[in-house]
A protein has these predicted regions:
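Amphipathic helical hotspot of TIR/SEFIR-family domains
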Residues: 101-102, 116
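General alpha-helical segment detector with a strong preference for membrane-spanning helices
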Residues: 10, 94, 120-121, 137
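Glycine-rich, charge-decorated loop segments at or immediately adjacent to ligand/cofactor-binding or catalytic sites
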Residues: 93-100, 127
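Nucleotide-state-sensitive switch-loop elements of NTP-binding domains
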Residues: 1-84, 98, 109-110, 125
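G-domain G4 guanine-recognition motif of GTPases
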Residues: 3-5, 60, 89-92, 114-121
């Protein structure tokens, strides 16, 4: 099940809804509130009621450290107590992606990173920094 928790990007909820419909995947949407922890809680309850094996909480992208948005993720984490916390990062961000990953790991205890666009340009080397920094922890 997908849970639409990106309440900031215009049309993010609509985009996730279309994707879920195309793939015949259940999706929890709430266009009536911008309270991300509430939406997450509702989606979590719906997933349990429907016996979902997997729940993905699609949250707003964060290109740099934004304390309010990271705090929002901490609240979401407390609401649903996830088994996995994955950061999806654009390798083109280079060193900034490493800084984001470090902060997210410190605050959320990441269990993994999905790095996109690693073949797009030279900044794809950020993945080596992720690996190196993770090995140091």
């Amino acid at each position: 099940m997908l849970v639409a928790c990106d309440v900031y990007r215009p049309a993010a909820i609509d985009q996730l809804e279309v994707l879920a419909q195309q793939e015949n995947f259940p999706c929890h949407l709430n266009r009536e509130t911008k309270d991300v922890p509430q939406i997450a809680r509702e989606g979590w309850e719906e997933s349990k009621k429907n016996g979902a094996d997997l729940v993905i909480f699609d949250t707003a992208g964060r290109l740099q450290i934004d304390d309010d948005l990271v705090s929002e993720l901490e609240l979401l984490k407390r609401e649903v107590n996830p088994h996995e916390i994955l950061l999806v990062a654009d390798a083109a961000l280079g060193q900034e992606a490493v800084n984001v990953a470090k902060t997210f790991h410190e605050r959320l205890n990441l269990t993994g990173i999905i790095l996109t666009k690693v073949d797009g340009d030279a900044r794809g080397g950020a993945c080596l920094l992720y690996t190196s920094d993770a090995a140091d922890d």
